[in-house]
């Protein structure tokens, strides 16, 4: 593009065309959604203590990256996409392109870090606080920004595409010969001839043959050309009677310095007239993404494809873990309420657990296993080491599955029964069972080979209880016969029952919360792929086949990727109850406070007017009139008392 075409470009812009203004308004509306939504996310986390978690640190970082996209990228991108003219200068063009890649890459890498955080939370819930601590989360966030900067940095130091610059050189009859040269966008005022050697680009030869009118050799002077036997120079011929290019020929130089063309155009004898006095760079009204193939592949892999595959891997593992745990909960954990039978003293509630007995592990090992019980003891609560050592079980060399049913009385009947217990009896306080326990072995027959013990701390407060499966059937049957004899403190037994139920339900509730959070973030990742995958596909195709990508389609897909920055806060509002509540509270603080005050004042005024009208209406009953008169008198008395006179 020559200087004349560049000047005509800025003059041809229709700034006030209705279609352009409507398009600009739509793009700016998207920008407002990006800024407003991500500001809400940041404010919600900082204003709500409930939302201050490690996972939400990554969400805030994601919102910061999206907010910077809305502030530093989208306003300028909207102007460029609508008018196709860059009016902000070449320096800001370079900075804008780098910031665009930086912020978008940081947003994508934040989604990758969130998927890693959810994977650890779902698959390792017990060790999650130590694995993903606040310090480690902050270090990971810092690494995200550094890695994103390394992806956007190369164009700032010269890794850019070669922009074509066309300059006329020679008039020849009805044709004008010119060189199609290239200039690196990192260089100002220097041109390199577009030489093609064999099948790749060749640099200027160190000692090119001299061609021209006797002047000193200058490789950037259009009057000279470094030509050898294997080099080719592309020369275009433009018909002076037409505004379009009529022919493009290839001039091949031999070692005898003779030049022949298909159109018999003698380059050596052409008079060097109308040469441009200055060689200008690229048009300042253009600011586009680079088409350098190497950088396109480098940035596309680092910004999108590698993070996308990492996220898909983590969520596939999360899905598998969620399916396994949900199946275990549905099959091995069930709570039902039974009806009160005739003559029974308990309103039973049945708690069904599923236990796996593994090989070569004792009870102490089971306490350190994460969710996989490798011994014959299932712990409800946190038993003390003394109790664990006292009731430690022997190692087993087989593997079977046991279904255990724990029947415990209601809190009312336990309190009623506790009044008849002997608190001071040490043997009953430490050894008697509180619940009746039965379990089914692998043969399907029900057995009574189990016993539920309870542990009691000082002051009669029970801390935990655990279930032990043993072999002594006669002794166990004898102990179970004493189940109805409840000893100990009346407050410890309901506490034992509630503690065991609370621990199990808390674990299940925590898992379901983690699974729900993972589902919400999976939707975020799905929207991320939907928004960015089409653009990065076209982004890779364009350097290899520029005619294959329609410019309008490329712009639409580019802004579809930008829309991902506006979609994330909407997903939080739709699927997260905590974020939704925080959003409502922030919005009401900003917009509803004045309206509520005016509404209250209007209500007070309407109530007073209604009282006055009711007191003056003659059609009401005498009692109502007396009541209204009393209200009016009280109102008048209150007004008189409030009168400063």
Swiss-Prot record:
Q: Which residues are glycosylated?
A: 2, 174
Report the subcellular localization. Answer: Cell membrane
Q: List the disulfide bonds.
A: 93-287
* Primary location: membrane
Query: A GO BP term, please?
Result: ovulation
Q: Which Pfam families match?
A: 7tm_1
* Extracellular topological intervals: 1-25, 78-94, 160-295, 542-551
- Which segments show compositional bias classed as Basic and acidic residues? 629-645
In what way does this protein cross or attach to the membrane? Multi-pass membrane protein
Q: Which CDD domains match?
A: 7tmA_Octopamine_R
- Which GO CC annotations does the UniProt entry carry? dendrite; membrane; plasma membrane; synapse
GO function terms (MF aspect): neurotransmitter receptor activity; octopamine receptor activity
Phenotype of the disrupted gene, per the record: Viable with no gross anatomical defects and females display normal courtship and copulation but are impaired in ovulation. Many mature eggs are retained in the ovaries with mutant females laying significantly fewer eggs and taking much longer to ovulate an egg. Increased sleep with longer sleep bouts during the night and a greater number of sleep bouts during the day. Severely impaired learning in appetitive olfactory conditioning which tests the capacity to learn and remember the odor associated with a sugar reward.
In residue numbers, the region (Disordered) covers: 190-212, 358-386, 479-500, 621-645
**Tissue and organ distribution:** Highly enriched in mushroom body neuropil and in the ellipsoid body (at protein level). Expressed in oviduct epithelium (at protein level). Expressed in the adult and larval brain, thoracic and abdominal ganglia, terminal cells of the larval tracheal system, muscle, mature eggs and reproductive system.
**Which regions face the Cytoplasmic side of the membrane?**
47-56, 116-138, 317-520, 573-645
Keywords per UniProt: Behavior, Cell membrane, Disulfide bond, G-protein coupled receptor, Glycoprotein, Membrane, Receptor, Transcription, Transcription regulation, Transducer, Transmembrane, Transmembrane helix
Q: Which family does it belong to?
A: Belongs to the G-protein coupled receptor 1 family.
| Name of the featured protein | Octopamine receptor Oamb
């Amino acid at each position: 593009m020559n200087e004349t075409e560049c000047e005509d470009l800025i003059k041809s812009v229709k700034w006030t065309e209705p279609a352009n203004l409507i398009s600009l308004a739509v793009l700016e509306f998207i920008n407002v959604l990006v800024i407003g939504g991500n500001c809400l996310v940041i404010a919600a986390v900082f204003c709500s203590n409930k939302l201050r978690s490690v996972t939400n640190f990554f969400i805030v970082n994601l919102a910061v990256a999206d907010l910077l996209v809305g502030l530093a990228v989208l306003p300028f991108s909207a102007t460029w996409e609508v008018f196709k003219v860059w009016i902000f200068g070449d320096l800001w063009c370079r900075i804008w392109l780098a910031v665009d890649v930086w912020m978008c890459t940081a947003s994508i890498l934040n989604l990758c870090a969130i998927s890693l955080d959810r994977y650890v939370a779902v698959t390792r819930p017990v060790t999650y606080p130590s694995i993903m601590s606040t310090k480690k989360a902050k270090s990971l966030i810092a690494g995200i920004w550094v890695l994103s900067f390394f992806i956007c940095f190369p164009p700032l130091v010269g890794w850019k595409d070669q922009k074509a610059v066309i300059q006329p050189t020679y008039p020849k009859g009805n044709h004008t010969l010119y060189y199609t040269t290239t200039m690196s966008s990192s260089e100002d005022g220097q041109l390199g001839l577009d030489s093609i050697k064999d099948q790749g680009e060749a640099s200027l030869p160190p000692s090119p043959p001299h061609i021209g009118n006797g002047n000193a050799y200058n490789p950037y002077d259009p009057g000279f050309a470094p030509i050898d036997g294997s080099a080719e120079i592309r020369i275009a011929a433009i018909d002076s009677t037409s505004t379009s290019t009529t022919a493009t020929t290839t001039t091949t130089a031999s070692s005898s310095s003779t030049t022949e063309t298909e159109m018999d155009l003698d380059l050596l004898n052409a008079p060097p007239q109308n040469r441009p006095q200055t060689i200008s760079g690229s048009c300042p009204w253009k600011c586009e993404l680079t088409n350098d193939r190497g950088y396109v592949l480098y940035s596309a892999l680092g910004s999108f494809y590698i993070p996308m595959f990492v996220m898909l891997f983590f969520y596939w593992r999360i899905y598998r873990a969620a399916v396994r745990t949900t199946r275990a909960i549905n099959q091995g954990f069930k709570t039902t309420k039974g009806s009160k039978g005739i003559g029974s003293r308990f309103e039973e509630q049945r708690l069904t657990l599923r236990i796996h007995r593994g090989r070569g592990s004792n009870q102490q090992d089971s306490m350190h296993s994460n969710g996989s019980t490798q011994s014959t003891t299932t712990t409800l609560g946190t038993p003390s080491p003394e109790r664990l050592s006292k009731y430690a079980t022997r190692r087993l060399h087989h593997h079977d599955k046991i279904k255990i049913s724990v029947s415990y009385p209601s809190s009312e009947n336990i309190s009623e029964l506790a009044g008849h217990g002997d608190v001071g009896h040490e043997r009953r306080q430490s050894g008697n069972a509180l619940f009746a326990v039965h379990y089914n072995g692998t043969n399907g027959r029900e057995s009574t080979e189990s016993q539920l013990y309870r542990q009691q701390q000082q002051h009669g407060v029970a801390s935990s209880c655990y279930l032990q499966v043993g072999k002594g059937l006669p002794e166990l049957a004898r102990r179970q016969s004493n189940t109805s004899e409840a000893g100990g403190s009346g407050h410890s037994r309901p506490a034992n029952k509630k503690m065991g139920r609370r621990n199990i339900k808390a674990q299940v509730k925590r898992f379901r919360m983690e699974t729900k959070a993972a589902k919400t973030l999976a939707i975020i990742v799905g929207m991320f792929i939907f928004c960015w995958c089409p653009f990065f596909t076209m982004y890779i195709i364009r350097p290899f086949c520029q005619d294959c990508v329609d410019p309008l389609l490329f712009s639409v897909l580019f802004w579809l990727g930008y829309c991902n920055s506006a979609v994330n806060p909407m997903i939080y509002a739709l699927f997260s109850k905590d974020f939704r509540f925080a959003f409502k509270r922030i919005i009401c603080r900003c917009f509803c406070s004045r309206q509520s005050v005016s509404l209250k004042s209007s209500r007070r005024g309407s109530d007073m007017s209604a009282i006055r009208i009711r007191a003056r209406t003659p059609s009401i009953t005498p009692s109502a009139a007396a009541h209204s008169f009393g209200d009016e008198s009280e109102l008048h008395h209150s007004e008189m008392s409030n009168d400063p006179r």
